[in-house]
Amino acid sequence: MFIRNAIDTDIQSIYEIAQQEGWKTFSIEKIQQLLITSRIIVIEVNNEVVGYTRFLTDETVTLYITELVVTKTHRKKGYAKALIDYLLAQFPSVRIELLSENNSFYEKLHFRNIGTGYRLP
């Protein structure tokens, strides 16, 4: 298992993972733009990208996770937790925030459900 910053050659893998999740608005072009405007880290297993997280941060106060996803065939193996642990190690003094429906996963990692957040379509 290896975690690193995403590079241009990862765009196709990120696209395929997003498509697996049914995220039809994620095009190759959009992912290319996201690689410029936000930060993406990937997790590799046997030289295959099996998951990624995209986030925004000011590196001082807040880190906001916009996506965290692992391929369906690689779930329940600790890879999502490894991505979170990587963020915690890289940004030890910032607060991590996110919106998610996977409450049990994040609660196991000691995230608190603060019940706030709003979204415009």
Task: Give names to the regions the model predicted.
Residues 1-13:
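A short beta-loop-alpha structural element at the N-terminal edge
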Residues 16-27:
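Helix-loop element at the rim of GNAT/NAT acetyltransferase active sites that forms part
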Residues 31-42, 60:
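A short helix-loop-beta-strand connector motif used in the catalytic cores of GNAT acetyltransferases and
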Residues 39-53:
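Conserved beta-hairpin
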Residues 57-65, 75:
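A conserved beta-turn-beta hairpin within the catalytic core of GNAT-like acetyltransferases
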Residues 74-83:
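Conserved acetyl-CoA pyrophosphate-binding loop and the N-cap/start of the following alpha-helix
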Residues 81, 98-121:
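Conserved active-site alpha-helix within GNAT-family acetyltransferase domains
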Residues 89-101:
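Conserved GNAT acetyl-CoA-binding A-motif
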